Amino acid sequence: MNFSKNQRAVIAHIPDHNLLVAASAGSGKTTVLIEHVYQQLLSGKSIDRFLISTFTDAAALEMKNRLEKRIRAGITEEEGQLKRHLQEQLLLLNSAAIGTLDSFSLRIIERYYSVIGLDPRYRMLADQTEKNLLVKDVLDDTFDEMYHDEKFLRLLNNFSSASHDQDLKNLVIKLNTMAETRANPDFWLDSIAENYRLSGGLTKGSFWKELLQPQIFNRASAALYQLLSAKKGVEDLEDYHSYIAYLADAVGLVRGFIEVCSQNNWQQMSDYFVNNSWPKSARKSGKNEQEADYFDNWIKPWIKEAKDSYRSIESDFLFLNESQWLDISEKSLGVVEELIRLTKVFRKKFALKKRELSLLDFSDGEQFAYQILQNQTVREEIQSLFDEVLVDEYQDINDLQENILTDVSNGSNFFMVGDLKQSIYGFRQADPVNFSNKYIQYKEGNGGELIELSENYRSQHNVADFTNAVFRKLMDRKLGGIDYRGDVELKAANRDYPKNLKNVADISIFDIDEESNEDEDFNSRQAQIEIIAAKIQALVGQSEIYDRQSGKMRPLVYRDITILERSHSWENDIQTIFKKYHIPINVAAGNFLQEFEVSIVLSFLKIIDNPHQDIPLVAVLRSPIYGLDENQLAEIRTADMKHDYFSALQAYAKTGQDLDLQKKMAAFLVQLENYREIAADNQIVDLIWQIYNDTNWPEYVAGMVGGSQRQANLHALYQYAQQLSDNHFVGLFSFIRYVEQLMDSVEDFAQAPVDMGQEAVSVMTIHAAKGLEFPIVFLLNLDKQIDNRDSNGAMVVDFDNGIGIDFVHPTSQVKIPTIQKIAVAEKIKEKNWAEEMRLLYVALTRAEQRLYLVGSSKRMSDLIHNWGTPVSIGKKVIAFQDRMRAKSYQSWIGMSLANSGYIKLDKVEGNYSKKDLTFKIESYNAQTIPKIVENKAKIKQNEQEETGIDLARSKKILDYNYPYKIESELAAYHNVSELKRVFEDPDSLLMPEMNSDRQPQITELPEPKFIGGNDQEQVSSTDKGTATHLILEKIDWKKEIDKDYLQQLIKENIPDQKTRQSIELDRIIWFANSEFGTEIKKSASTLKREQTFAMLIPAKQIYQQVETSDPVLVHGIIDGYFISDGLITLFDYKTDRFGKDYVSKLKERYSGQLNLYAAALSSIYPNLKVERKVVVGLQGKRLIYL
């Protein structure tokens, strides 16, 4: 590989001084880091003399794999002693210190636990559910013990109430979570109260100089910038020359205040507002309409914004005099100190509880490791173990991790790699200040060396150029953490892309016309998704991309496309609309508790606990499980209009007029009562399993868009309930309440992961996409407002700037935000905006070849004004105040392009090619969005008013013999299992009838087992096969697969005793120990199981009677496959009982099915060959190679 000059400098670095590698997106930092380590090995060093810290376990595994690959390549290149040395390194690699800092911290604890008196028999508290329950118990005990304390009661009054203390508990948890990531948690907790100790006055000390005064200056400066812009604008408007003097007076007013503010005297600032009012507005002198439009659209808003910004200084800060603020600060100090004391008490109790139970959580691991490292003898011993300490993703470490790494290094062997522009984990307490400080110091030549890698080997030049055009005007040290210019900018360095490959950045804006009469159902969200769907349809099959592996152009396919989103909130809409367009989709992990399929089960549990809840009851009845429509629900309501809906349902089940509906509801009530009895006598996990079995809900959701993910989510709910049961968390009501409290915990309740390599468009959040790259990227919802929730609430807290609270007067109960809260909240907002800016950078730099941006605006005129901030034209970066005033990515992108002179503000739509940057902007409305026009045209044709009947024409139509009758009877969508009979008899068209909405509606529920009295009911072959497949899916092929292991696996995953007993363990053990099972074990790293796929197949390839090539969408789930030496082996489990001619019947029945699987894998992996197709006949213990 040809390395750049800076890459070679990193690779050749000798660890006799600290090095910071600032590696931009796509700069090959991991490749360079691997090569650096390899070159150190060639110099005679050993891999076990390196500490390599990664951000995630997955990154550590990738690092090891790539190092192994590089060492193996070196072994083939080298000879003699050097070759033997590399072979030794290969043996040492698995035990090398390559992993997360969590794992390294545990290594320290395991060896030196006695230094801090830790019990070595501890257990890792890895289960977040278990930790949450333990936190809840300790917090409840802590509060119960303090209710007699007057200070605690005053604290409770300030943040909660005696009857509802959860708000205060949440504040304690938040402070504890932040403290856990500091090297000295108690010291940090004490420090956050410092801003309330104002003995020297309000305009003295660090609170004034570092927080309050800069923010007042910022507001005044914002007003000044806007006024100067307005003044410059009216100089060219003859009718508005009178405004020049008015604006000059306003400019003088604001400049005067800035001067007073620099005097550090609160009273003088207050007096200035009292004695100097805003000047009286001027009047225009003419009737030039063009000038009037310009003034109204541009100048007038700037004047208003300037006035508002200036007056906010008085309304937010100067409405109280200094003595009043000092009095509130003094009283608030007592509240803050009590909150800190309460947090410390909880921390101490929680630590004691964990020691009592011999538990350690991950934060303990790093805290204890840091404490051990404070022992000088131990610290020096650990330092002596490593020749070099390397850390990847350095921008995302926290204060505690920084201190651990600094202590482990010897002061001159610290190798740090990262990109400040990609620091996006503030919600995990990551602190980019560590990177920023070293970047500044090293750039000035103090403390270490800085090497910048700005060459981008990922993206085509159009992506890199567009990203630079946006961030050149947006990011600087003040907002973003780094000045985006020079070596920091991306430099497209991939010379493999064809020179004639002309791709442009594509910006699409949906124009929401509030005055139009369009359907309210057609909203911005749907419109943006429709735009993306239409563009994807236009791309796939009709466009080509450059394949970087083959070095050739090839047709663009679905898996080349990824849609990035800021959050998971649009995913259901994306799935629904994409289904209409027949676009396969793969959605990455979100919060599974909030997904549709899980919410229905949670609603079911709610009404089992208490059926007198209208919303969850109607949700269950309306769901596909029972399939009631609005008319049926309304009819049930009429049975009892005075009481709740459940009472009406009970009445209807007795006297309903629709006999079918009455019978259905009577059966529902019997079933509900049965579930209530199960809930009373069994664990929650048993109840959930029973619901799954009775309703076939998991099987139904498998047929929906994203079926495999939905099934995984339902299984995750079952496993979560199992975890709670294992931790002695009992009671349906308590379970429901607990889940409701944690519904917003996206990080703790991520969806079960699915394979992203399927032939489908991928959808994921920007966070999930970090570190990945995709040929085509769509970034949607550009106009989504930047989230600023953590700068609101009763308490705001920041690592560097302390805590801000609302003060509640103990007698009057009047609530007022402290001046500290106002200042800290503003600082938090700045950090939020900076992180969102870095998130936008991550999103844009995921694209390799094409970038599509989609957003909306209520009025294009408002959007244009939002983008036009001429205050900053000619400056290197847009004014800080303008960037902070932006509320979305869309605002930032537009104002950056406008201020760079790339786009015209009189009409933003169009194709732009300027300064080597090419992009286009398109606007859409409800009439112009692709496909919507066609749909609406069809609807209008169907709704045409009848004016007469042409009988001759009608007869001709009715007598018409349709030549494609057979084709019209075919379903457009099939599951592979439904095609099984076609493979057995290609002439058969007897496909299973499918309801168009595929609803498993229950018209008559089965008789409950306790009524029928059939205690000997056998497990069905279907249930047995499903259970067997589930166990085979869960097997860890790296473990010894014996009877004990399988019984434990069954116990964890199959709650029903009879189903457990029906699984034939000897057949699974036979398979695991077979020659083929041994192959799977060897290929465990590439093994994929339960992989869904969807593909289009010409109908005539399935049905011999059909002539058309129209495609049929086939969906299926492959039991498993693995890749070895570039060849794919796929396999499928079968539990059929055939007896005679076992092998031939399995071949006959399933060869077509596996051929489809092979075709699907060939489309997913176009460069790999499917070598073998294996049917695993479990009943006959036969391996059948097709």
Swiss-Prot record:
Keywords, alphabetical: ATP-binding, DNA damage, DNA repair, DNA-binding, Exonuclease, Helicase, Hydrolase, Isomerase, Nuclease, Nucleotide-binding
InterPro entries per the UniProt record, alphabetical: AddA, DNA_helicase_UvrD-like_C, DNA_helicase_UvrD/REP, P-loop_NTPase, PDDEXK-like_dom_sf, PDDEXK_AddAB-type, Restrct_endonuc-II-like, UvrD-like_ATP-bd
Catalytic activity, EC: 3.1.-.-, 5.6.2.4
Biological process terms in GO annotation: double-strand break repair via homologous recombination
Molecular functions (GO terms): 3'-5' DNA helicase activity; 3'-5' exonuclease activity; ATP binding; ATP hydrolysis activity; double-stranded DNA binding
Name of the protein: ATP-dependent helicase/nuclease subunit A
Organism classification: Bacteria, Bacillati, Bacillota, Bacilli, Lactobacillales
NCBIfam families per UniProt: addA_Gpos
Cofactor(s) the protein requires to work: Mg(2+)
Similarity remark: Belongs to the helicase family. AddA subfamily.
Domain of life of the organism encoding this protein: Bacteria
Catalytic activity: Couples ATP hydrolysis with the unwinding of duplex DNA by translocating in the 3'-5' direction; ATP + H2O = ADP + phosphate + H(+)
Span of domain UvrD-like helicase C-terminal: 487-771
SUPFAM superfamilies: P-loop containing nucleoside triphosphate hydrolases, Restriction endonuclease-like
Domain UvrD-like helicase ATP-binding: from-to ranges: 2-460
Subunit description: Heterodimer of AddA and AddB/RexB.
GO CC terms: cytosol; DNA helicase complex
